[in-house]
């Protein structure tokens, strides 16, 4: 079952990206490297509940 999730950068508090994941294949929190326009570099965004 695929669910929509929000990705947040913990240090700046940005919630810019929406994506989906399969809960069966990825039960842990998703972490993706994405571009942060606020910091102007690629940083790690983490799944938020």
Swiss-Prot record:
SUPFAM superfamilies: Zn-binding ribosomal proteins. Keywords: Ribonucleoprotein, Ribosomal protein. One of its GO terms (biological process) is translation. InterPro entries: Ribosomal_bL33, Ribosomal_bL33_CS, Ribosomal_bL33_sf, Ribosomal_zn-bd. GO terms for cellular component: cytoplasm; ribonucleoprotein complex; ribosome. It comes from the Bacteria. GO terms for molecular function: structural constituent of ribosome. NCBIfam families: PRK00504.1, PRK00595.1, rpmG_bact. This is Large ribosomal subunit protein bL33C. It comes from Streptococcus pyogenes serotype M1. The gene is rpmG3.
């Amino acid at each position: 079952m695929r669910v929509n999730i929000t990705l947040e950068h913990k240090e700046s508090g940005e919630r810019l990206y929406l994506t989906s994941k399969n809960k069966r294949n990825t039960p842990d929190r998703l972490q993706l490297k994405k571009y942060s326009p606020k910091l102007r570099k690629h940083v790690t965004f983490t799944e938020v509940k």
